[in-house]
C-alpha cells in the first residue's frame, strides 16, 4: 500500500496564499486550506465581507508529500521560506508545524471533504471537479481541482479579483493574467466573455496546475498559459491586466502594465494588505493610472485602475 506524508502548518490568514505556494514549491502534491471564513461569511453585492468573517486570525494548511520525500529537509525549507514572508510585509503569526504518515486512500479523500460548490460573485460559482452540480439559470461555473495546489479560489484576494473582472469585462476583450496560480482568474475571464487570455507565472508548477484546471472547463481554448516573469518581454496590448500577487511585486509591474494596457483599459491589482496600500497606489498613479474602484475585505485590498481620467471610489467594509 502506498503511503503519503502529511505536513500541517498553522499561519495567520494574511499569509495563507503565500504559505500554500511555498508548500507546493517544496514538492507538495496538493494542499488543503481549512479556513472557516471561506464558508461562514456573507458576501455583499459588491464583495464586502461582514466583520465576523475576519475574527478568526489563523488558518490551517495541510500539504501532502510522497512517502519517499525527506520530511526533515522539507520541514527546514518550509520554515526558512515562511520566515522570509515578513520581508514582504506578511505576518505569519506563531507558526505551528506537524507531520504524519497516511495511506493512499486517506490522502485521496481527506482533502475532498473540505470543499463544496461556492458562489463567489453574482454570476460565478466555483465547483470542485469531482462534484455533480446542477447549474442555475445565469450561473457561470468554474471547475477547479483544489487538490492540485493554490487553494479553492475563495480567498478574499481572489474573490475581489473575480468581482473586479465581473465589473469591467463586457465581452471581446484581451486579458493578461499575471501570476496566474490556479488559473481561476483566466477561466473566469473566458466565462465573462473575454476574447483571448494570456496567463503567465514564474513558477513552472503553477503553469502546469493552471493548464490542468483550464482543461477542466469547456470553451477555454482561448486561454494561453506560459512561463513568464511578470510582464517583462511582453508585447501584447490588453484591455485588462489582472494581477493577484504580493504588493511588493505589484509595484514592479505598474510601468509595464501602463505600456501594455490600451487607452480606456483597466489594471486590476489584488493581494494588497492595508499597510502596503499606499505604496501600490503611489506606484500605479506614478505610472499614469487613475483609481476607479477600491475594494476592501478585512486587511486585504483590491484596486481597479483605468488608463484615463476617472473618479475613485471605495467598496467594502
UniProtKB/Swiss-Prot annotation:
List S-S links within the chain. none
Can you say where in the cell this protein is located? Cytoplasm
Binding positions for S-adenosyl-L-methionine per the UniProt entry: 158, 179, 201, 244
Record key words, sorted: Cytoplasm, Methyltransferase, S-adenosyl-L-methionine, Transferase
List the catalytic activities from the record: L-lysyl-[protein] + 3 S-adenosyl-L-methionine = N(6),N(6),N(6)-trimethyl-L-lysyl-[protein] + 3 S-adenosyl-L-homocysteine + 3 H(+)
* One Pfam family it belongs to: PrmA
Cite the EC number.
Answer: 2.1.1.-
The record's NCBIfam families line, in alphabetical order, gives: prmA
Superkingdom per UniProt: Bacteria
What protein is this chain from? Ribosomal protein L11 methyltransferase
Q: Does the keyword Nucleotide-binding apply?
A: no
Entry GO MF terms: protein-lysine N-methyltransferase activity
Question: What InterPro entries has UniProt attached to this entry?
Answer: Ribosomal_L11_MeTrfase_PrmA (IPR050078), Ribosomal_PrmA_MeTrfase (IPR004498), SAM-dependent_MTases_sf (IPR029063)
The family note in this entry says:
Belongs to the methyltransferase superfamily. PrmA family.
- Taking the record's annotation, the residue ranges forming a coiled coil are none
Q: What is the first-listed, main subcellular location in coarse terms?
A: cytoplasm
What the protein does comes down to:
Methylates ribosomal protein L11.
Q: Name one GO cellular component term.
A: cytoplasm
An example Gene Ontology biological process: methylation
Amino acid at each position: 500500500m502506498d503511503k503519503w506524508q502529511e505536513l500541517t502548518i498553522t499561519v495567520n490568514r494574511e499569509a495563507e496564499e503565500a504559505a500554500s505556494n511555498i508548500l507546493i514549491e517544496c514538492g507538495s502534491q496538493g494542499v488543503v486550506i481549512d479556513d472557516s471564513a471561506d464558508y461562514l461569511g456573507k458576501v455583499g453585492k459588491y464583495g464586502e465581507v461582514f466583520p465576523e468573517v475576519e475574527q478568526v486570525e489563523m488558518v490551517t494548511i495541510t500539504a501532502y508529500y510522497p512517502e519517499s520525500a525527506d520530511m526533515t529537509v522539507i520541514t527546514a525549507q518550509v520554515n526558512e521560506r515562511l520566515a522570509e514572508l515578513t520581508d514582504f510585509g506578511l505576518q505569519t503569526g506563531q507558526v505551528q508545524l506537524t507531520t504524519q504518515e497516511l495511506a493512499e486512500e486517506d490522502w485521496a479523500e481527506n482533502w475532498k471533504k473540505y470543499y463544496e460548490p461556492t458562489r463567489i460573485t453574482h454570476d460565478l460559482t466555483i465547483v470542485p471537479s469531482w462534484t455533480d452540480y446542477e447549474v442555475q439559470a445565469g450561473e457561470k461555473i468554474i471547475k477547479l481541482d483544489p487538490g492540485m495546489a493554490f487553494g479553492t479560489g475563495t480567498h478574499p484576494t481572489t474573490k475581489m479579483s473575480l468581482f473586479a473582472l465581473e465589473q469591467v469585462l463586457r465581452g471581446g476583450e484581451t486579458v493578461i493574467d499575471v501570476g496566474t496560480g490556479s488559473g481561476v482568474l483566466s477561466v473566469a475571464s473566458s466565462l465573462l466573455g473575454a476574447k483571448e487570455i494570456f496567463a503567465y507565472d514564474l513558477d513552472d508548477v503553477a503553469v502546469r496546475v493552471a493548464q490542468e484546471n483550464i482543461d477542466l472547463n469547456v470553451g477555454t481554448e482561448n486561454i494561453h498559459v506560459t512561463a513568464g516573469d511578470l510582464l517583462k518581454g511582453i508585447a501584447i496590448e490588453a484591455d485588462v491586466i489582472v494581477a493577484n500577487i504580493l504588493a511588493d511585486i505589484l509595484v514592479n509591474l505598474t510601468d509595464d502594465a501602463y505600456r501594455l494596457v490600451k487607452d480606456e483599459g483597466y489594471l486590476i491589482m489584488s493581494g494588497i494588505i492595508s499597510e502596503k496600500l499606499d505604496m501600490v497606489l503611489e506606484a500605479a498613479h506614478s505610472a499614469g493610472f487613475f483609481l476607479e474602484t477600491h475594494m476592501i475585505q478585512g486587511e486585504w485590498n483590491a484596486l481597479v485602475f483605468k488608463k484615463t481620467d476617472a473618479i475613485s471610489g471605495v467598496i467594502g467594509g
